[in-house]
Amino acid sequence: MNNYMINPSIVDLLTKVDNRYSLVTVTSRRARQIIDGDEALVNVEDAYKPLTTAIHEVNAGKVSYESLVEGIK
């Protein structure tokens, strides 16, 4: 079993977004953009996967999103 901490931590990432659901949505959509050819906004040495890059971008404050106030009608 690996004995290391995930960096950045979930606690740190949750300070950048409203809640866990927003974190999942923002990082997954950004990872999809990277897969589709968008340039990475941060340089992460060991980021082999688009999701890892997206997580580091959220942590660096490079990714923004807009919460919709309206609910389902």
Swiss-Prot record:
Q: Which domain of life is it from?
A: Bacteria
Q: Name one GO cellular component term.
A: DNA-directed RNA polymerase complex
Q: Which GO terms describe its biological process?
A: DNA-templated transcription
Q: Which sequence ranges are marked TM in the entry?
A: none
Annotated GO molecular function terms are: DNA binding; DNA-directed RNA polymerase activity
Keywords in UniProt for this one? DNA-directed RNA polymerase, Nucleotidyltransferase, Transcription, Transferase
Q: Has the keyword Transcription been applied to this entry?
A: yes
Q: Which EC class is the enzyme in?
A: transferase
UniProt keyword Ligase present: no
Its UniProt entry gives the catalysed reaction(s) as: RNA(n) + a ribonucleoside 5'-triphosphate = RNA(n+1) + diphosphate
Which InterPro entries would you find in this protein's record?
A: DNA-dir_RNA_pol_omega (IPR003716), Pol_omega/Rpo6/RPB6 (IPR006110), RPB6/omega-like_sf (IPR036161)
The record's SMART domains line, in alphabetical order, gives: RNA_pol_Rpb6
E.C. number: 2.7.7.6
The record ties this protein, via HAMAP family, to: RNApol_bact_RpoZ (MF_00366)
The UniProt subunit note reads as follows: The RNAP catalytic core consists of 2 alpha, 1 beta, 1 beta' and 1 omega subunit. When a sigma factor is associated with the core the holoenzyme is formed, which can initiate transcription.
State its role: Promotes RNA polymerase assembly. Latches the N- and C-terminal regions of the beta' subunit thereby facilitating its interaction with the beta and alpha subunits.
Which family does the entry's similarity section mention? Belongs to the RNA polymerase subunit omega family.
> Mind telling me what this protein is named?
DNA-directed RNA polymerase subunit omega
To which species is this protein native? Clostridium novyi (strain NT)
